[in-house]
């Protein structure tokens, strides 16, 4: 099985919260696609609570689109990582990491402004697979933590696992 890009970086050295360009590619028509690793938690040390990450999933995508879309950028998708330490954001365009970090912080400010669970988009049995598994309080705790800790940039070069280590891990 081919090695996924996300498994070629050393998770023991990742900082969080931090932005990292996880992958860049071009469509057959030449459009640039960038995938960002938006790391909310330090891998293997922290994890977002399931209700909080689920609520954040509903809020974060819209807020990020409000702040980032335009000027050659359009978000395709923002999805939580299975390990619950962050989100992947796929988009058309090539915004730099600092722009993404600034927008991420603005989106966290927006999360803190949500006053009631009823303001969470698509929070119903028809549009959400587990519509009762939400917590606005947990989502706001996550947002507050991001803003208090600030958002850094993780460098692929600094995090790259050496080929010897990948071989040692039998990958």
Swiss-Prot record:
It is an enzyme of class 4 (lyase). Disulfide bonds: none annotated. Its EC number is 4.4.1.21. Gene3D superfamilies: S-ribosylhomocysteinase (LuxS) (3.30.1360.80). Fe cation binds at residues 54, 58, 128. The keyword Lipoprotein does not apply. Pfam families: LuxS. The keyword S-adenosyl-L-methionine does not apply. Belongs to the LuxS family. Involved in the synthesis of autoinducer 2 (AI-2) which is secreted by bacteria and is used to communicate both the cell density and the metabolic potential of the environment. The regulation of gene expression in response to changes in cell density is called quorum sensing. Catalyzes the transformation of S-ribosylhomocysteine (RHC) to homocysteine (HC) and 4,5-dihydroxy-2,3-pentadione (DPD). HAMAP family: LuxS (MF_00091). Homodimer. This is S-ribosylhomocysteine lyase. It comes from Escherichia coli O157:H7. The lineage of its organism: Bacteria, Pseudomonadati, Pseudomonadota, Gammaproteobacteria, Enterobacterales.
